[in-house]
Amino acid sequence: MKHILSVLCLLAVSFWLQLYNAQTPDAYVEVLGVAQDGGFPHMGCNKEGCNLAWEHPELRRNVSSLALVDPVQKKWWLFDATPDIRRQLHDFSQRHNREYPYLPEGVFITHAHIGHYTGLMEFGKEVMNTKQVKVYVLPKLKNFLESNGPWSQLVGLKN
């Protein structure tokens, strides 16, 4: 079922991009991360590939995430709020010479693995204390976020 929802999300994004591209031909997707939920190397990993990445930071990879970028409107949307969100948002801003808002127009959470929603906590009062960042999720995850801390605090404070 999880894979079906992920595929449906990707199809919806693809369809939306096609519609959006009809109006804004320059919109594109930028990869912000490609690794599984824990990033690469994984915490506690002592295998050869992990050891190389610990020794050579250029081999490290952020958790899987995408940015949908509209260069005409200077807006962007984030797909998945990962544990690497601080670095991903900073790097995005640097790559684009701060021409875009630091925060995205909205955040789409594709599914409920920890690598896809735990970065939302960085929007809370202890870090950025954002105001009304739009987050798009499926109903079951919406209920989870509204009913469980620390996520419910984000909802309550309208971060």
Residue ranges and their predicted role:
Residues Q23-N159:
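Binuclear metal-dependent hydrolase catalytic cores
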